[in-house]
Regions:
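Soluble catalytic domains of enzymes that build or remodel membrane lipids, polysaccharides, and related
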Residues: 1-110
Length: 110
């Protein structure tokens, strides 16, 4: 189990704080409340439930009934969460309507 206070210790002088946290529900449960200086959290875990519908302007998956943030970019105030649907699977060895993904994040100085 992770220890966010321990991981966060010593980051006071960092201009930008990026966090990798497997489960996106961790963002609302702890990161946003206790660590408002974390700029971006990167998560996965949901796999988009490996099933859903995704067309321009509409995205649905049954995973949204279990995870408020389940795929893509979310923002609350100055904090961001990005949830990647990943490449793998759990249980059924495939995907229907939810493509696997690899995200490339390019960081640059403002």
């Amino acid at each position: 189990r992770g220890d966010l206070p321990k991981a966060h210790n010593g980051t006071e002088k960092a201009k930008v704080k990026l966090l990798l946290s497997h489960d996106p529900s961790h963002w609302e449960a702890q990161v946003r409340r206790e660590f408002p200086d974390v700029d971006v959290t990167f998560s996965g875990h949901t796999h988009g439930a490996q099933f859903g519908v995704e067309i321009p302007g509409f995205r649905w998956s049954p995973v949204q009934y279990f995870y408020k943030q389940w795929a893509g970019l979310y923002q609350q105030g100055k904090q961001y969460l990005y949830v990647n649907r990943g490449l793998g699977f759990l249980g059924y060895p495939g995907r229907v309507g939810i493509s696997p993904e690899i995200t490339v994040v390019e960081l640059s100085r403002a």
